[in-house]
Curated annotation (Swiss-Prot):
It is found in: Cytoplasm. The lineage of its organism: Bacteria, Pseudomonadati, Pseudomonadota, Gammaproteobacteria, Alteromonadales. This is Glutamate-1-semialdehyde 2,1-aminomutase. Its EC number is 5.4.3.8. Keywords: Cytoplasm, Isomerase, Porphyrin biosynthesis, Pyridoxal phosphate. Belongs to the class-III pyridoxal-phosphate-dependent aminotransferase family. HemL subfamily. HAMAP family: HemL_aminotrans_3. GO terms for molecular function: glutamate-1-semialdehyde 2,1-aminomutase activity; pyridoxal phosphate binding; transaminase activity. Its cofactor is pyridoxal 5'-phosphate. It comes from Shewanella sediminis (strain HAW-EB3). Homodimer. The gene is hemL.
Length: 428
C-alpha cells in the first residue's frame, strides 16, 4: 500500500468520500487518488515522492506553472502586512483596474472568493436587473454548485453519473431552462416559449466541463443577437477560460461582447478567488449602489489580490499566449498522432492553453451528446497508463487538460513518448 493509499483510507474516516471535491476521488477512473505534497514548475510530487508532469494545473489557475517565483514573492510580501482586513484595500482597486484593462466588456468588477460565488451573484444580478426569474443554461456546462445551476450540470456531476443533485427543491429548478450547446435553434425555441421571462443566458464560451468543446462558428454571436432581441442579459462564464484562452479571455478570442462576465482560477494565481463584472449600468444594481444584495467576508482579500496581480502582470508580457497556444497544439495533435499510430480512434479539441481528448471515431466533437457517446472504457485504461508513466491528467473523461508556461520541450517530448507506449499496450 502506498502512502497515498494510506492517506486516502485515513481521509475517508473524517472527510466524505475522502476528498473535498468529488472528482478528486478517482471515481471516474478507479483506484486511489494521489495525495500531493508539493509542486514546482510543470511537476507535482505525491506523498510517496513520485514526480508527475502535470496537465491539471489545479484545474486551470497555474498558467505560469506551479510555485512561480514572482507569485510566491508577491504572496510572501503581502503576508508581512496581514492576511485579511475586512476593509477596502488599494490592491483590490488595482486588480479591478487590471481586469477592466484586459477585458473591455467589464466596465466595473466585484471581487468574490470562488467561481461559484461569481456565477451565483451574476445570475442574481441579472434577475434583479431584468425583473425576470428564469435563466437559460446549456446541458453539460458547469457553473459551480449553486442550486439553480445544478440542473443537467457537467464536470463532476457527469463523472459521478448525477446530472442533477438531491437537495434542490423543484421550485428552484423550474426556473432553470436547459438548451443544447452549439445549437441556436434549441435556444430560440425556449425564448419563443418564454419571451418575457428569461433574465439571462449563462454559458461557458468553451465548454470545459464536458471535456473541451469550443463554440461552432456563429454560436456565440447568435446568442448575443437572441439576448438583444428579447432583452435578456448574456453572461459568459470565463472562470475557466478567462486569461487562459487569450489575454482578453474567450470573449476576446471569439469576438463577442457579453453583458456580464464571471472570472476565477487564473486571476487568483492559485489562491481562492472569483469575480464578476460587466456593463456599468448593470453593475450599479449591486449593493451598496443598488438593491441586489451580495457580500463576502474575504472578498478582495490582499493575499489573493497580490498573487493574482503578479500572475496577470506576467501574462501581459509579449508572446506569452502565442507560446502557450503552440505548446497546446503540439501536445494535443501529438496525442492524436500517437493514438492513430496504434489504431485507436481519437478526436481532439484545443484552444489557447486547454485541450480535450475524446475516444471516438467521430472526426470532430462539438456537442454534449457526442461526448456522452465516447468510449467510456478506454479513458480509465489510458489514464492509469499515463499515471504509471509519470503523467498526471484530470481523473475524468469530462475534464479539460491544461498547459502552463512551465511546460518545456522536455516535458512535451516525455509526455508524448509515454502516450505512445500506453497506446501500444492498449492496442494489444
Amino acid at each position: 500500500m502506498t502512502r497515498s493509499d494510506e492517506l486516502f483510507e485515513q481521509a475517508k474516516k473524517t472527510i466524505p468520500g475522502g476528498v473535498n471535491s468529488p472528482v478528486r476521488a478517482f471515481n471516474g477512473v478507479g483506484g486511489s487518488p494521489r495525495f500531493i505534497e508539493k509542486a514546482d514548475g510543470a511537476y507535482i510530487y505525491d506523498a510517496d515522492g513520485k514526480a508527475y508532469i502535470d496537465y491539471v494545473g489545479s484545474w486551470g489557475p497555474m498558467i505560469l506553472g506551479h510555485n512561480h517565483p514572482k507569485i510566491r514573492e508577491a504572496v510572501l510580501a503581502a503576508v508581512e502586512n496581514g492576511l485579511s482586513f475586512g476593509a477596502p484595500t488599494e490592491l483590490e482597486v488595482t486588480m479591478a483596474e487590471k481586469v477592466i484593462e484586459m477585458v473591455p466588456s467589464m466596465e466595473q468588477v466585484r471581487m468574490v472568493s470562488s467561481g461559484t460565488e461569481a456565477t451565483m451573484s451574476a445570475i442574481r444580478l441579472a434577475r434583479g436587473f431584468t425583473s425576470r426569474d428564469k435563466i437559460l443554461k446549456f446541458e453539460g456546462c458547469y457553473h459551480g454548485h449553486a442550486d439553480c445551476l445544478l440542473v443537467k450540470a457537467g464536470s463532476g456531476a457527469l463523472t459521478l453519473g448525477q446530472p442533477s443533485s438531491p437537495g434542490i427543491p423543484e421550485d428552484f429548478a423550474k426556473h432553470t431552462l436547459t438548451a443544447t450547446y452549439n445549437d441556436l435553434e434549441s435556444v430560440k425555441a425556449l425564448f419563443e416559449q418564454y419571451p418575457e421571462e428569461i433574465s439571462c443566458i449563462i454559458l461557458e464560451p468553451v465548454a470545459g466541463n464536458m471535456n473541451c468543446i469550443p463554440p461552432v462558428e456563429g454560436f456565440l454571436q447568435g446568442l448575443r443577437a437572441i439576448c438583444d432581441q428579447y432583452g435578456a442579459l448574456m453572461i459568459i462564464d470565463e472562470v475557466m477560460t478567462g486569461f487562459r484562452v487569450s489575454k482578453s479571455g474567450a470573449q476576446g478570442h471569439y469576438g463577442v461582447t457579453p453583458d456580464l462576465t464571471t472570472l476565477g482560477k487564473v486571476i487568483g494565481g492559485g489562491m481562492p478567488v472569483g469575480a464578476f463584472g460587466g456593463r456599468k449600468d448593470v453593475m450599479q444594481f449591486i449593493a451598496p449602489t443598488g438593491p441586489v444584495y451580495q457580500a463576502g467576508t474575504l472578498s478582495g482579500n490582499p493575499i489573493a489580490m497580490s498573487a493574482g496581480l503578479a500572475q496577470m502582470d506576467a501574462l501581459c508580457e509579449e508572446g506569452v499566449y502565442e507560446e502557450l497556444a503552440a505548446k497546446t497544439k503540439r501536445i494535443a495533435e501529438g496525442f492524436k498522432a500517437a493514438a492513430n499510430k496504434h489504431g485507436i480512434p481519437m478526436s481532439i479539441n484545443y484552444v489557447g492553453g486547454m485541450f480535450g481528448l475524446f475516444f471516438t471515431e467521430e472526426e470532430k466533437v462539438t456537442s454534449f451528446e457526442q461526448v456522452t457517446k465516447c468510449d467510456a472504457d478506454k479513458f480509465p485504461e489510458f489514464y492509469h497508463g499515463m499515471l504509471d508513466e509519470g503523467v498526471y491528467l484530470a481523473p475524468s473523461a469530462y475534464e479539460a487538460g491544461f498547459l502552463s508556461m512551465a511546460h518545456g520541450e522536455k516535458e512535451l517530448e516525455e509526455t508524448l513518448a509515454a502516450a505512445d507506449r500506453v497506446f501500444a499496450k492498449m492496442a494489444k
